[in-house]
From Swiss-Prot:
The keyword NADP does not apply. This is Probable chaperone-like protein YdbL. Residues 1-21 form the signal peptide. Disruption phenotype: The deletion mutant does not show any growth or outer membrane permeability defects. Keywords: Periplasm, Signal. It comes from Escherichia coli (strain K12).
Length: 108
């Protein structure tokens, strides 16, 4: 329960960051990035701006996952996968997510 509450607080923080969220939202709606079940973004377009955004966000996510894992005595991979499931589930229509089979699909 504690792990879920901490993860929810982390996810709210990700979305509410004014500068990052707007840029991330734009990238999502433009089909430039996609969410995975592993908790990290993937650049679907290989331009420098998109790749930098993905690298920056994934670095922030990894740091948060490491902190949560340490606090809850679980693996970083477990935290990342839990976050990934929630991020994929919360993706809006038109945004890309990677299915369990590894294929990219646009949510509808």
């Amino acid at each position: 329960m504690k792990k879920t509450l901490l993860l929810c607080a982390f996810l709210v923080g990700l979305v509410s960051s004014n500068v990052m969220a707007l840029t991330l939202d734009e990238a999502r709606t433009q089909g430039r990035v996609g969410e995975t079940f592993y908790g990290y973004l993937v650049a679907l377009k290989t331009d420098a701006e998109t790749e930098k955004l993905v690298a920056d966000i994934n670095a922030e996510r990894k740091a948060s996952y490491q902190q949560l894992a340490k606090q809850n005595n679980v693996s970083v991979d477990d935290i990342a996968k839990l976050a990934g499931q929630k991020l994929v589930a919360r993706a809006k229509p038109g945004e890309y997510v990677q299915g369990i089979n590894g294929k990219w699909v646009r949510k509808f």
